[in-house]
Design a protein with these regions (language model features):
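Terminal "cap-and-tail" regions of soluble proteins that handle hydrophobic small molecules
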Residues: 46-73, 79-84, 177-179, 189-328
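Terminal, regulation- and interaction-focused segments at domain boundaries
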Residues: 80-107, 128, 245-252
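Sec-exported extracytoplasmic/periplasmic mature domains
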Residues: 106-116, 265, 269, 273
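Glycine-rich portal/gate segments that line the openings of hydrophobic small-molecule binding cavities
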Residues: 123-187, 209, 290, 297-328
């Protein structure tokens, strides 16, 4: 029906109602129509799906993956997913810590503790923290896996954000606009929520973006010097039935995410020991955890790794001391 015809029809009907009924009845009829209209509008608004909270999404992820966590190929409750799309590489690691949610929150909500975590990575030569008005900065000093003085490293500045902290949910993000070697939009995220048995379900994700030029360089690297460096995702089987693992940027980001996951676990495992003993214990613990996955994570002999980290830790403490004294 044409719109003009609709309006004329409505006018005729209203006039008909008005003529046949008293004004009071007409007003009742009018109020009825308004009420129905409001009910429909409210119903339509409520039918629009609200954005899901991070806590709900993480809890749903836990329930959907309970069986996978119990039968994980890692040999412990740990699963990994990754993707590579356009200029972005992303990985998610999910696992279970045998520690209470409150103990996880108390450790990770302190920005300085993240330097103890990330500096376990072989490529992180030092990490410092600094508080600014309304912001925390974590500076990663990135270099080769062997020992390097700090002046030979690349600095990447991360912003620490405690996005959400509730009684039953924690969400922390470390973000850097510019990364090493032309990468950008680096985001490390940590989520946690309590589950049964006094344990904590955790999520560690990492992502970054790169450029076309960097993609070409990466392909050359992984086809030559980086040949044989693989991640954890199985893409098929070889002629004798052995698994073929993902390589390239996805393989690299999977390795790094698992290293950071085990770094968090190592720090958590040693909180019960005196502060002065923790550094040497957590470097040894981290090495032992990662050495279970030699194909993906082996880089250095344990003796060399511990020696390099001991030197790097001294450099880190000296640098952090100068920042605390206002010299940096």
């Amino acid at each position: 029906m044409h719109i003009g015809c609709k309006y004329r029809f409505i006018a005729v009907m209203v006039n008909h109602v008005f003529q046949r009924h008293k004004i009071r009845n007409f007003l009742k009829f009018f109020l009825f129509i308004v009420t129905v209209a409001l009910l429909f509008s409210v119903g339509s608004a409520s039918s629009v799906e609200k954005p899901r909270r991070g806590e709900d999404i993480l809890l749903d992820t836990y329930h959907r993956n309970m069986a996978k966590l119990e039968t994980s190929s890692f040999g412990l409750p740990l699963i990994l997913e990754s993707f590579e799309r356009d200029d972005k590489v992303h990985v998610d690691v999910y696992g279970i810590f045998d520690y209470s949610f409150s103990s996880v929150v108390n450790m990770l909500k302190i920005p300085a503790n993240w330097c103890d975590i990330v500096s376990l990575h072989p490529n992180i030569k030092a990490c410092t923290y600094k508080e600014l008005p309304g912001d925390w900065l974590l500076t990663f000093y990135i270099g080769r896996k062997v020992y390097q003085p700090l002046e030979d490293t690349r600095q990447v500045i991360y912003h620490y954000r405690n996005v959400d902290q509730q009684r039953g949910y924690l969400d922390i993000i470390l973000s850097a606009g510019e990364g090493p070697f032309g990468t950008k939009d680096h985001n490390m995220r940590f989520e946690a929520l309590p589950i049964d048995g006094g344990r904590t379900f955790v999520h560690v994700s990492y992502s970054y973006s790169d450029s076309v030029a960097l993609r070409f360089t990466e392909k050359v690297y992984f086809a030559t010097l980086g040949w044989g460096k693989v991640g954890f995702t199985v893409t098929g089987k070889d002629s004798v039935g052995n698994p073929i693992y993902i390589g390239g940027p996805r393989g690299a980001i999977e390795r790094n995410a698992v290293r950071y996951y085990f770094a968090i676990q190592s720090v958590m495992d040693l909180l019960r020991y005196p502060q002065e003993n923790r550094f040497s214990m957590r470097t040894s613990k981290w090495y032992d955890l990662t050495s279970r996955y030699r194909k993906q994570l082996f880089e250095l002999d344990k003796k060399d790794y511990l020696a390099f980290k001991a030197k790097e830790h001294k450099n880190q403490m000296t640098l952090q001391g100068s920042i605390g004294a206002g010299l940096q």
